[in-house]
């Protein structure tokens, strides 16, 4: 015990001698308060942060000498600024994700354009979003089908396009004859309105093919056989 007490006393005496050097008294209960950076110091630090967010030891030392700060204080300031930028970025990303989730899944599909109809060359495309009255007004003023529509005609299987019997191989399903006219069935979205029949403009095989037997398929080899 005596030996331990002597060593402790000598150590305390040596520390006391070092503490009073330079007319400075060491207070073990002294609390060091954080110093706020001035506007001039903050301006230099922010300008440096824009060009280099992670300054090395030499840069921190130069900044400390220039601003009257310790290199450790400069290092802490840059650490805090990087953490602040990271936090703001994460917050902005979370807000963006919440905004996208509130819009719902329909918002992504609404911007996409509808697929083109396979038979849009045979009949006009009718958007489903349009009012119901649009389906009942046909033919339109700019339509080539100016003929009237027969009443009481049966409604067979729905099909796209029009043509004459035997034209299925060319992509034109046949029309039905009613009196002296021939009519094709207009295609509407399922469940919207009843099927209606319209009279196409008059044409025959010779209008498109010299003979249905001469050219069995579009682009096929000619055949000398006549109808």
Curated annotation (Swiss-Prot):
Keywords of this entry: DNA-binding, Homeobox, Nucleus
Gene3D superfamilies listed in its UniProt record: Homeodomain-like
Residues forming coiled coils: none
Polar residues bias locations: 92-102
Any one cellular-component term (Gene Ontology): nucleus
Database matches in InterPro entries: HD (IPR001356), Homeobox_DNA-bind_prot (IPR051000), Homeodomain-like_sf (IPR009057)
Localization per record: Nucleus
DNA-binding residues (ranges): 30-89
Main localization (coarse): nucleus
Keyword Nucleus annotated: yes
GO biological process, one term: regulation of transcription by RNA polymerase II
Protein name as annotated: Homeobox protein HD-10
GO molecular function: RNA polymerase II cis-regulatory region sequence-specific DNA binding
PROSITE patterns the UniProt entry points to: HOMEOBOX_2
Region entry Disordered, spans: 88-115
Organism: Encephalitozoon cuniculi (strain GB-M1)
């Amino acid at each position: 015990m005596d030996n331990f007490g002597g060593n402790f006393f000598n150590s305390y005496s040596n520390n006391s001698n070092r503490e009073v050097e330079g007319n400075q008294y060491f207070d073990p209960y002294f609390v060091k308060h954080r110093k706020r950076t001035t506007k001039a110091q903050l301006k230099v630090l922010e300008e440096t942060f824009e060009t280099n967010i992670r300054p090395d030891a030499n840069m921190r030392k130069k900044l400390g000498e220039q601003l009257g700060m310790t290199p450790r204080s400069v290092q802490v300031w840059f650490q805090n600024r990087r953490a602040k930028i990271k936090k703001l970025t994460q917050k902005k990303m979370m807000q963006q994700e919440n905004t996208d989730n509130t819009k719902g899944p329909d918002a992504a599909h609404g911007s996409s354009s509808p697929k083109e109809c396979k038979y849009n060359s045979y009949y006009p495309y009718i958007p489903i979003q349009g009012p119901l009255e649009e389906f009942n007004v046909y033919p339109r003023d700019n339509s080539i089908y100016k003929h009237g529509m027969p009443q009481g005609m049966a409604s067979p299987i729905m099909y796209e396009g029009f043509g004459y019997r035997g034209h299925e191989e060319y992509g034109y399903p046949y029309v039905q004859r009613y009196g002296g006219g021939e009519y094709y069935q207009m295609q509407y979205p399922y469940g919207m309105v009843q099927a209606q029949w319209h009279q196409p403009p008059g044409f025959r095989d010779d209008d498109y093919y010299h003979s249905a037997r001469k050219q069995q398929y579009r682009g096929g080899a000619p055949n000398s056989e006549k109808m």
